Design a protein with these regions (language model features):
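Flexible loop/turn connectors
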Residues: 109-157
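Alpha-helical recognition/docking segments in bacterial nutrient-uptake
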Residues: 2-116
């Protein structure tokens, strides 16, 4: 069963600590902005169990493709190898990925991936996370809808 809606995109999240804390606020900001501005809908993928994605990244990517997911917002996993495996699996299925990170955590080098850096100082992150999510959504939904060659890093301050 496909989840695509007419003339709207469907985006997925894979964010390990999305249930609470600043990342939950960032995800909420992206979701609210996407729905409010008519870009599309955002759905959590493996909300409570990101380890399932790591166990079978190619199966996860295939399921995303079959479900009609148009793009994925991914927070880097603690182990860079795990992040690369998931990125590569999604790329094989031709699903655009936006890799989210705060400041300089988990730097990933990989041609063809959009890396979005959300700049913030310490505790400020939890207060401005919703706004950062909103700004990230505007920038990323445009880039996921119309990929540029080559993708470049986007820094939001």
């Amino acid at each position: 069963m496909k989840v695509n809606l007419r003339n709207r995109s469907v985006f997925g999240f894979v964010i390990p600590d999305m249930v609470k804390g600043p990342w939950a606020d960032i995800a909420s900001g992206i979701r609210q902005t996407a729905q409010r501005d008519g870009h599309g809908v955002c759905v959590p993928l493996c909300w409570d169990n990101p380890a399932a994605v790591l166990r079978h990244p190619s199966v996860f990517a295939r399921l995303c493709a079959e479900a009609g997911i148009d793009g994925v917002f991914l927070r880097a996993f603690p182990d860079r190898k795990d992040t690369r495996r998931v990125l590569s699996a999604l790329r094989r299925e031709k699903i655009p990925v936006a890799l989210l990170r705060v400041n300089d955590e988990s730097p990933i080098c990989g041609a063809g991936f959009d890396v979005v850096t959300l700049r913030s100082e310490g505790r400020v992150l939890s207060r401005v996370a919703l706004r950062l999510g909103s700004v990230a959504c505007h920038a990323l939904l445009q880039r996921l809808a119309k990929p540029r060659n080559p993708p470049a890093d986007l820094v939001l301050e």
